[in-house]
Every structure is written in C-alpha cells, then in structure tokens.
UniProtKB/Swiss-Prot annotation:
Taxonomic placement: Bacteria, Pseudomonadati, Pseudomonadota, Betaproteobacteria, Burkholderiales
Keywords: Iron
Family: Belongs to the Fe(2+)-trafficking protein family.
Gene Ontology biological process: cellular response to oxidative stress
GO cellular component: cytosol
Listed name of the protein: Probable Fe(2+)-trafficking protein
Keyword Iron recorded: yes
Organism for this UniProt entry: Cupriavidus pinatubonensis (strain JMP 134 / LMG 1197) (Cupriavidus necator (strain JMP 134))
Stated role: Could be a mediator in iron transactions between iron acquisition and iron-requiring processes, such as synthesis and/or repair of Fe-S clusters in biosynthetic enzymes.
PANTHER family membership: FE(2+)-TRAFFICKING PROTEIN-RELATED
Claim: Iron is one of the keywords in the record: yes
Length: 90
C-alpha cells in the first residue's frame, strides 16, 4: 500500500514520495509533506530554471540557489519564475 501524505503544495491527501529526495532536514521535511505529483511539478520547474537561467550544476552557487528555490516552492512564497517564460494558453 502506498504511503499517503497531506500534500502542502496541492492541499490534498496524495501518494507520498518513496524516500527523502534530498539529504538533511529539507529532504526529510519534503518527504513528510510533499506528494509524488507535487514533486514531479517541482522537477519540471527546476529543469526550466536550470535551462532558462543557464545554471551550471557543477557550480556550488547554482546548487545553493536551487536548494533555496526548492524550499521557497514548497514552504515559502513560491520559487522564481524563469525569465522570459510565457505559459501556454489554455
């Protein structure tokens, strides 16, 4: 049976992650309160931030930036939007 969590991002009960996605306290916090669906949404947003901002993941500053954005995305006021990104029309 799947582990269920009250997802902080989607505001509903949903299937939780199988393991903490990051090391440390942030990973534990995400594992306890973020669903697989919300995590998949973050991975898409993270990819967009990396590509649009041309982040070099070998650079420690880029990795720290993404960790801060991860925390803001789930537990803060929301992550940065990629500069120049225009969402598709519905």
């Amino acid at each position: 049976m799947a582990r269920m969590v009250q997802c902080i991002k989607l505001n509903k009960e949903a299937e939780g992650l199988d393991f903490p996605p990051l090391p440390g306290e942030l990973g534990k916090k995400i594992w306890q309160s973020v669903s697989k669906e919300a995590w998949a949404g973050w991975l898409k947003h993270q990819t967009m931030l990396i590509n649009e901002n041309r982040l070099n993941m070998a650079d420690a500053r880029a990795r720290q930036y993404l960790l801060k954005q991860t925390e803001k995305y789930f537990f803060g006021e929301g992550a940065d939007e990629a500069a120049g990104y225009v969402p598709p029309q519905a």
